[in-house]
Curated annotation (Swiss-Prot):
Residues 1-15 are cytoplasmic. It comes from Komagataella phaffii (strain GS115 / ATCC 20864). PANTHER family: MAP7 DOMAIN-CONTAINING PROTEIN 2, MICROTUBULE-ASSOCIATED PROTEIN. Its EC number is 2.4.1.-. It holds the Pfam family BMT. Disruption phenotype: Impaired expression of beta-mannose epitopes and decreases alpha-mannosidase resistant glycans. Keywords: Cell wall biogenesis/degradation, Coiled coil, Glycoprotein, Glycosyltransferase, Membrane, Signal-anchor, Transferase, Transmembrane, Transmembrane helix. It is a single-pass type II membrane protein. This is Beta-mannosyltransferase 1. Its main location: membrane. The chain crosses the membrane at residues 16-34. Belongs to the BMT family. Residues 35-652 are extracellular. Residues 535-652 form a coiled coil.
Length: 652
C-alpha cells in the first residue's frame, strides 16, 4: 500500500486537477479487494480474492453453463526417479468449461477509422465499387486472432485483434494486416465507440482515448503488395505496484529494420507510439520469427522512466529463454536446454504466461507460470494438420527453466469450425483451434466456498475470436502441492512449493512428459476426428486421391503417347530428311557425272574435229604439194619442149 500512496502523491502533485480521479481509483482498488502484497509468503496457499468477483457481473456468471472436461497431464517430477513410462508421469483431473462466446467486431466502424487514417485511406479505392457497403465489408474485410487482458481500473477487457484487407476477397491473400484495439464490458459486449481516461505509466498524465483504435505500427507496404503488415498479436500486462495497467503488445512484422525478414516487435500503446524490434545479440536472424511466449519475473523493474525487461520462451524444443529490454528491444539468450532436454517439434508458441492467482510458499529463486501452448500434429486423425491448445506449468528454479506439467490436447468442448467453413470440424485440410491469450484469472469467495475462473481467448479456423471460461483450474493445479483431492494413485505433494530440479532426471522426465502428452494428443485427435467428419473426409480424400491418381496416370499415359507420337514423327522426319539428302546427293552425283560426260564428249568432239582438221590440212598440203610438183613437172616439160623447139629451130 505504501507504493500505491507514493504513486498517488506523485500523480496528484503533477496533475492537481486529477485528484478526484485519483480518489475514485483508490476507492475502486479498495472495493475490488486489491492487496499489494509480496508474491512469496510463508504458509499454505493463501486465497486473497475480492469479496465479489472482480472480472464478472453476477448476471453474466449466472448465465454461464459449465460442463466437466478431463485434463490429462504429465509431470516431470516423480520424486527424483527417472521415469520410463507415461503412466508413471500421468496426472488426471477435472475442470469445468463454459460454452464458447464469439466476440463481436463492429467492422463498419473499424473500416471507417482505417479509411480516415493518412496511411491507409487509399484502401477505399481498392474495394469493389459496384456493390453496397455491407457487401464490401463482407468481401474485403476479415478478422481473427484476438488476444485480450482485463484492465481492472477501467473494468473492461482490452483486446487486440488482426484486421485484414484483401483486394481479391480472400482472407488467405490479404494486401495488409493491421492491429486494432477494442474494449469489451464485463459481459463481453463490445463497446463502440468508448472512451477511456488512460494514465500514461511514464508521465502520469491522463489522456482520453477512444476505442476501437488502430495501434500505430510503421508498416512498409503498397497497394500491389500481398501479406504485408502485422501478424499474431499477443497482449499481456506488465506487473504494476501502482494499480495502473500497462498492456504490452507483441507481434511479428516484415520490415527493413530486420533486412526484409519477419521479426518480432513490441509496443506499449498506453505509454507511447514507439515500436521496438526485438533483436537477440550474437544470433543470426531467421527469415521468420514467431511464436515467442512472454512472461515477467518477480523482480521486474517498475519505473516511470523505464518500461523494464520481459522474458520470452523463444522455443520449447530446444527450450530457449531470452531476456529483452522493452525500452531498446535488445535481447540476450539466458537459458538453452542441453541436447538431452529436447523432444519433437509438435509443441509451438504459447499464450502469454501468468502467475497463479494465489500466494504460494515458494523457495527463493523459484517461480511458476501457467500458459497454453498449442500442438501441431500431422495426419493424426482429424484433417491433415491439427492445432489444439495444451496446458503447461512452466517453472524457474535459480537459473534453470523447465516444463513441470504438460497436458494432452484440450478443445474445451468446442466443435471447431472447419477450415473451409463448409463441413464438420475435420472436413477441411487443417483443423485450427489456437489459444491467443489469458485474459484474466479471477478468484472469489462466495458463501463459504471459493471459486476460480480463467478466461481464455482463442481463434477457430483463422476466422474468428472466441472466449471460454475455465473453472477449477487452480484447484486442479493445487493438488500438485498437496491441496485438495487426489484423483489417482500418485502423490504430488509439494511439487509446486519445493525445489526439485535435478539435471540428471528432470530434463529427461520433461522430455518424456512432452512425448507422452504428444502421444496422448494424437490419441485425442483420432477420437475427435472419428465423430466429426474425419471418416467422410478421409473417404473423400481417398476418392480425390484416387481420381487424382487416375488423372495423373491418364495425363502421364497421354503424355507418353504424345511423346511417342512426337518421337515417331521426329524419326519419320529425320528419315525423310536423310532420304532427301541421299536423293539430293545422288542427283548431285548424277549431275556431276553428266557434266563430266558432257565435258568428255565435248573434248572428244573437239579432238576429233582437230584431228579431222589436221588430216584435212595434211591432205590439202599433199594435194598442194602434188599440184606444185605437177606444175613444176609441167613447167619442166614445157621448158624441155621449148628447148626442143629451139633446138629444132636451130637445126632447121
Amino acid at each position: 500500500m505504501v507504493d500505491l500512496f507514493q504513486w498517488l502523491k506523485f500523480y496528484s502533485m503533477r496533475r492537481l486537477g486529477q485528484v478526484a480521479i485519483t480518489l475514485v481509483l483508490l476507492n475502486l482498488f479498495v472495493f475490488l479487494g486489491y492487496k499489494f502484497t509480496p508474491s512469496t509468503v510463508i504458509g499454505s496457499p493463501s486465497w486473497e480474492p475480492a469479496v465479489v468477483p472482480t472480472v464478472f457481473n453476477e448476471s453474466y456468471l449466472d448465465s454461464l453453463q459449465f460442463t466437466d472436461i478431463n485434463v490429462d497431464s504429465f509431470l516431470s517430477d516423480t520424486n527424483g526417479r527417472i521415469s520410463v513410462t507415461c503412466d508413471s508421469l500421468a496426472y488426471k483431473g477435472l475442470v469445468k468449461t463454459s460454452k464458447k462466446k464469439e466476440l463481436d467486431c463492429d467492422m463498419a466502424y473499424i473500416r471507417r477509422k482505417i479509411f480516415s487514417s493518412e496511411e491507409y485511406g487509399v484502401l477505399a479505392d481498392l474495394e469493389a465499387q459496384d456493390i453496397t457497403e455491407e457487401q464490401r465489408i463482407k468481401k474485403h474485410w476479415f478478422t481473427f486472432y484476438g488476444s485480450s487482458v482485463y484492465l481492472p481500473e477501467h473494468e473492461v477487457h482490452y483486446l487486440v485483434r488482426r484486421v485484414l484487407f484483401s483486394k481479391v476477397g480472400r482472407a488467405d491473400t490479404p494486401v495488409i494486416s493491421l492491429l486494432v484495439a477494442q474494449l469489451y464490458d464485463k459481459d463481453w459486449n463490445e463497446l463502440t465507440p468508448h472512451t477511456l481516461e488512460i494514465v500514461n505509466p511514464a508521465t502520469g498524465n491522463v489522456t482520453p482515448q477512444t476505442f476501437p483504435q488502430l495501434i500505430h505500427v510503421p508498416i512498409e507496404w503498397s497497394v500491389d503488395d500481398k501479406w504485408k503488415g502485422t501478424e499474431d498479436p499477443r497482449v499481456f500486462l506488465k506487473p504494476s505496484k501502482t494499480g495502473v495497467s500497462e498492456p504490452i503488445v507483441l507481434f511479428n512484422l516484415q520490415s527493413s529494420l530486420c533486412d526484409g525478414k519477419r521479426g518480432m516487435f513490441v509496443t506499449s500503446p498506453f505509454r507511447s507510439d514507439k515500436v521496438n524490434l526485438l533483436d537477440i545479440e550474437d544470433k543470426e536472424r531467421p527469415n521468420s520469427e514467431k511464436n515467442w511466449s512472454p512472461f515477467f519475473l518477480d523482480d521486474v523493474e517498475v519505473s516511470k522512466y523505464s518500461t523494464g525487461y520481459v522474458h520470452f520462451v523463444y522455443s520449447f524444443n530446444p527450450l530457449k529463454v531470452i531476456k529483452c529490454s522493452l525500452d531498446t528491444g535488445a535481447c540476450r539468450m539466458i537459458y538453452e536446454s542441453p541436447e538431452e532436454g529436447r523432444f519433437g517439434s509438435e509443441l509451438r508458441g504459447a499464450t502469454p504466461m501468468v502467475k497463479l492467482p494465489v500466494h504460494l510458499s515458494l523457495p527463493k529463486g523459484k517461480e511458476v507460470w501457467v500458459a497454453f501452448p498449442r500442438t501441431r500434429l500431422r495426419d493424426c486423425g482429424c484433417s491433415r494438420t491439427t492445432y489444439r491448445p495444451v496446458l503447461t506449468l512452466f517453472v524457474k528454479e535459480g537459473n534453470k527453466f523447465y516444463t513441470e506439467l504438460i497436458s494432452s490436447s484440450i478443445d474445451f468442448h468446442i466443435d471447431v469450425l472447419s477450415y473451409d467453413a463448409k463441413g464438420e470440424s475435420c472436413s477441411g485440410s487443417i483443423s485450427v483451434l489456437i489459444p491467443n491469450g489469458i485474459d484474466s484469472w479471477d478468484v472469489s469467495k462466495k458463501q463459504g466456498g471459493k471459486s476460480d475462473i480463467l478466461t481464455l481467448t482463442l481463434s477457430e479456423a483463422d476466422r474468428n475470436t472466441v472466449v471460454v471460461h475455465v473453472k477449477g483450474l487452480l484447484d486442479y493445479l493445487l493438488v500438485l502441492n498437496g491441496e485438495g483431492p487426489i484423483h489417482d494413485s500418485h502423490s504430488f505433494k509439494n511439487v509446486l512449493s519445493t525445489n526439485h530440479f535435478k539435471s540428471d532426471t528432470t530434463l529427461l522426465n520433461s522430455v518424456k512428459a512432452a512425448e507422452c502428452a504428444i502421444f496422448s494428443s494424437r490419441d485425442y485427435c483420432k477420437k475427435y476426428g472419428e465423430t466429426r467428419g474425419e471418416p467422410a473426409r478421409y473417404a473423400k480424400q481417398m476418392e480425390n486421391e484416387r481420381k487424382e491418381k487416375e488423372k495423373k496416370e491418364k495425363e502421364a499415359k497421354e503424355k507418353l503417347e504424345a511423346e511417342k507420337a512426337e518421337m515417331e514423327e521426329a524419326v519419320r522426319k529425320a528419315q525423310e530428311a536423310i532420304a532427301q539428302k541421299e536423293r539430293e546427293k545422288e542427283e548431285a552425283e548424277q549431275e556431276k557425272k553428266a557434266q563430266q560426260e558432257a565435258k568428255e564428249k565435248e573434248a572428244e568432239e573437239k579432238a576429233a574435229k582437230e584431228k579431222e582438221a589436221k588430216e584435212n590440212e595434211a591432205k590439202k598440203k599433199i594435194i598442194v604439194e602434188k599440184l606444185a610438183k605437177e606444175q613444176e613437172e609441167a613447167e619442166k616439160l614445157e621448158a624441155k619442149k621449148k628447148l626442143y623447139q629451139l633446138q629444132e629451130e636451130e637445126r632447121s
